[in-house]
Amino acid sequence: MNRKDEHVSLAKAFHDKQKNEFDFVRVIHNPLPQTAVADVDLSTQAAGFTLSSPFYINAMTGGSEKTKKINQDLAIVAREADLMIATGSVSAALKDPSLADTYTIVRQEYPHGKIIANIGAGTSVERAQEAIRLFHADALQIHLNAPQELVMPEGDRDFTNWKALIQEIQTAIDVPLIVKEVGFGMIRETINDLASLGVHTVDISGRSGTSFTQIENARRSKRELNYLADWGQSTVASLLEANEADTSMEILASGGIRNAYDIFKALCLGAKAVGTSGTVLTHLMNHGVEETIMLMKQWQEELRLLYTMVGATNIATLHQQSLIFSGPVKDWCEARGIDLVKYGRRTEKGV
C-alpha cells in the first residue's frame, strides 16, 4: 500500500482513541451576556488573510489516486463552507510530477479559495517556491515532524539544517509563511526561536488528535516504539506556552479538534484561527461530502451560539473570557511556571 494511503487508513483507525485535554478547560459562565446571535462576527485575521470563519481545514494528504479523491472532496467541503484549506505535504509531487494532480485538484475545485501548500522543514528554497507555484498557493506551511521522521523506518535522521532553511524560505517567498507542528505541540522557547528567524505565524498543533508516532510505529514490522504514541505537548498546553512567549507571534491552533466547543476553547486561549483535520477526514470517509459540508456549517452556527453565551461579539472579546483549568493541564502549568490564576480573572465585569 502507498505510504500516503497507509497514513489515511491508520489515522482513521486511531482517530476515536485519542485523549483530549480540552476536557480540562472550563469556560466561566456569564449569566448576563448582553449580546445577540445576530451581533456575532465570526471573522478573523490570520496569516495575512481575512477569514469568514475562525476555523479551517488543515493539512492532511495527497500523493496517490485515493488521496486525490479525498483532496477533491475536502476542497468541495471548504468551498461550500467558505473555509481556508491546507493540502498535505506536496513533497511527493515535487519528487514525481505525475502526482501533481493529487494536489492541484484542490485549486481546480476551489479556484477562489485561500489554499495553503505544505512542505517539510528540510525543504530547500527552490522546492518551497515550486510548491507555491504548483497550484498558486496563497500561503506556505512548513511542518516540523522530527518524531515522525525518527519513528518512520525510511524517515530523515538529520535535522541540523532546519532552522537555516526556515529562515531562508521566510526571506525568499512572497506569500505568508506558517510554521506548524504535526501533533507534538510547541513550547515558548520554540516560539521564541522561530520569531528570531523572522517567522510571524505558527500553528502549535499539539498532541490530542492524530499521532504520527503511533501511525509510523504501526508501519514498523515489530511495532517496538508504541510507547511514543503520546509523545509531545497537548494543544491546550501549547497554547498556554505560546501566551508566555517573549514575542507577538500570531498563533494558530490544531490537534484534537473534535467539535465547535474545542474550537471555541482554543480561541478563548488566544488562537487567531483553529485547524481541524482528523475529525473532518473521519466524517468525510464515513458520511460523505454533503454530510461533511453540513457539519462545517453546523459548527459555524454553534460558534455563534457559544460566542453569544459568554457575551462575545468577535474574536477579540473572546480572547478575554475567563477560564479554569484542572487535571494534567494544571499539572503542566505548575511545572512550567505558568500562572493560571490570571485566566480565571480575565473578565472583570459580568461574571
Regions found by a protein language model. Give the residues of each.
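Glycine-centered helix-coil hinge/cap
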Residues: 63, 136, 287-288
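Short, solvent-exposed loop/turn segments at secondary-structure boundaries
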Residues: 68-69, 97, 152-156, 286-288
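A gly/proline- and charged-residue-enriched helix-loop-helix capping module
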Residues: 82-118
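An N-cap/entry alpha-helix motif that binds or orients negatively charged groups
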Residues: 1-47, 51, 327-349
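Active-site cofactor/substrate anionic-group-binding motifs, chiefly glycine-
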Residues: 46-93
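Shared catalytic-loop signature of beta/alpha-barrel
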Residues: 262-264, 268-315
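Charged C-terminal helix
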Residues: 304-334
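Alpha/beta enzyme core
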Residues: 75-80, 111-116, 121-254, 260-283
